[in-house]
Each structure stands twice: as C-alpha cells, then as structure tokens.
UniProtKB/Swiss-Prot annotation:
It comes from Thermus thermophilus (strain ATCC BAA-163 / DSM 7039 / HB27). Its EC number is 5.3.1.23. It is an enzyme of class 5 (isomerase). This is Methylthioribose-1-phosphate isomerase. Substrate binds at residues 49-51, 83, 179, 230-231. Pathway: Amino-acid biosynthesis; L-methionine biosynthesis via salvage pathway; L-methionine from S-methyl-5-thio-alpha-D-ribose 1-phosphate: step 1/6. It catalyses: 5-(methylsulfanyl)-alpha-D-ribose 1-phosphate = 5-(methylsulfanyl)-D-ribulose 1-phosphate.
Length: 330
C-alpha cells in the first residue's frame, strides 16, 4: 500500500507533526504539536483519529510532556480524557507510566509502541487477506491514516486485492464525519484498489442485490465476549449482513481488547457535539436551532460476528474462549 502516515516525530525539534485529517482529501497539511496539552486537544478535535493512531499519538504526547516540562500527572489525565472509547489510548498511557521522569526511556517506549503497531498490522493484513474475497464492504476508516501502521480492516482488504482475492470495495461514506468518503476513498485510490463510494443507507440494498460478498470493519474497543464498539453505523451493518447471510468480520490488534469487560455493556460511548451532525465545514445542512444527537460509536453484539481477525490469526465462535487464549488469560 502506498501509505500516507498520520504523523511523524522530529526528535531534534521536539515536535510531533500530525497530518490534519480534517482537511483531507483536499489538502495534505501537517500541524506541529509541542506539548501534551496540544496533543490532547488534537486528539479531541480529530486532527488524528483511529484507535491505534490515537494510542501512538498519546504515547508521544507523554514524550512531549517531558520535553516541555509539563506536569506528567496532569498530562496523563488530559490525554486520557481526550477520547473515552478507544482502549488503545489507555493501554499506551499505561505503558508510558513506568518511564515518567525518564525522557530517554519514554522516547524508547513510544517508538516501541509505534513499531509494534506496524508489525501487528502487517500480520492482521496477512491473516485477513486469506478470508476476504469478491466484493467487500467497509465502514469508516481503518487504513494507515487510522493506525500509523498498515491498517486493520483496510490493510486486509488491500492485501486481499494484491493477492487477487478481492476485486472491488464498497466504501460507506460514514456520516457525519465522512471518514469513508474523505479518508478511505483517498487511501484506496492511492493504493490503486477499485472502489465505489456509497451513502450509508445504500448498504442494505446492495446486500439484497447480491453485490456484497463480505463486510469487514475495524474496532475501537472489544469486550472479552467479542462485543465491540466501532464507528456509529457498524451495528446496523452487522444486522443487515446477518439478515442477508453475508460474512461479517471485525479486524483489530489484540491491544484493542479490554480484558476488564465481560461484555459490551460496559464500553463507554463518546457523545460528540450535535453541531457535527447539522453542519459540515461551515455549511449548515439542517434548520437553525434544530436538535441533533451524535453518539460517535455504537456497540455490535458478538452474535453477529462471523470471525475476528487478529495478529494471531482469525478467531471463530465461541469468541470468549478464543480471545482469552489469544490474550494468554487461560
């Protein structure tokens, strides 16, 4: 895949450069981040997004806190509060804590987290490519822009295309932030993969017509039974795929599994500003003063999953047993 990475670290400058994903695909603009406070705001504002990419960014946020002389407890608190649903954020910050007060150790650990993301996603892509075929539908954005590596669901799709297994991709636009239209379409175009953009409401009709052979999505947080949170709209796709007898897969690094959660009932769901629903890039699309509701994620019950694609292979039901084994909890 011709990757456009969401960030880069300029160690000599003490600056973490973030690709402002709000401005894609029209502009590729990198913005400088010099403190943990700025990193937390960038994550909250979705300059960077996607669970693995948020985790890497948060880790480097703690490096920046050392460089800027910020209070480390406060920096950690701000970063944890930036996006509550993606568990990678918390895992990364937990790993950085033993290196508080140690700049060199902190930088080494942040780089290690980033390298592990790349290695893990290369494996996810290989495993996922073996089970995808024909025409695949995906939701939101799960490529390098969302991860800092090779991508999860999108990485598997691109690898499956390279192997001649997938011939075409249906891309949900993913309202209201349009990650599918702005980011997934952008990445697939760069990778040379044949794809077509659809509105979210078209998915069921495509399935009914036999135009979808499989659905694969990413994961922001998964419980031990396989219930998972992903971009809002995922649950509806899972129900539709189940109704039409279409395989439905979730692709994720095992770091996105929260071993503290027995089911999806305990996953916190971020609610974002209603303004993101009624307006986009300064253009209002609903009457002034009209109310809107904006949960950023929904939870899909594990019963709708055909399989879970991880760096250790593809897991099949019963998912609780497979996930516990993969995590080394048994």
């Amino acid at each position: 895949m011709d990757r456009v990475l969401p960030f880069r670290f300029a160690e000599e400058e003490g600056v973490f450069w973030l690709l402002d994903q709000r401005r894609l695909p029209q502009e590729e603009v990198y913005v400088p981040v010099r403190t943990a406070r700025e990193m937390a705001q960038a994550i909250r504002d979705m300059v960077v997004r996607g669970a693995p990419a948020i985790g890497v960014s948060a880790a480097f946020g703690m490096v920046l806190a050392h460089l800027a002389g910020e209070d480390l407890e406060e920096a950690d608190r701000r970063l944890r509060a930036s996006r509550p649903t993606a568990v990678n954020l918390f895992h990364a910050l937990d790993r950085m804590r033993p290196f508080w007060g140690d700049l060199a150790g902190s930088l080494l650990e942040a780089r290690r987290i980033w390298r592990e993301v790349e290695e893990t996603e290369a494996a996810i892509s290989r495993h996922g490519a073996q089970i995808l075929w024909g025409q695949v539908l995906t939701h939101c954005n799960t490529g390098p822009l969302a991860t800092g590596g090779y991508g999860t669901a999108l990485g598997a799709i691109v690898e499956a295309y390279r192997l001649g297994r997938v011939r075409h991709v249906w891309v949900d636009e993913t309202r209201p932030y349009l990650q599918g239209a702005r980011l997934t379409a952008y990445e697939l175009q760069k990778a040379g993969v044949p794809a077509t953009l659809i509105t979210d409401s078209m998915a069921g009709w495509l399935m009914a017509r036999g135009a979808v052979d499989a659905v694969v999505v990413g994961v922001d947080r998964m419980a031990l039974n396989g219930d998972f949170a992903n971009k809002v709209g995922t649950y509806a796709l899972a129900v539709l795929a189940h109704h039409h007898g279409i395989p439905f897969y979730a692709a994720l690094p095992l770091s996105s599994v929260d071993p503290r959660l027995a089911s999806g009932e305990g996953i916190p769901i971020e609610e974002r500003s209603p303004e993101e629903v009624v307006a986009f890039r300064g253009v209002r699309i609903a009457p002034e003063g009209f109310p809107a509701y904006h949960p950023a994620f929904d939870v899909t019950p594990h019963r709708y999953l055909t399989g879970i694609i991880t760096e250790k292979g593809v897991l099949y039901p019963p998912f609780a047993e497979g996930l516990r084994r993969a995590l080394g909890l048994d």
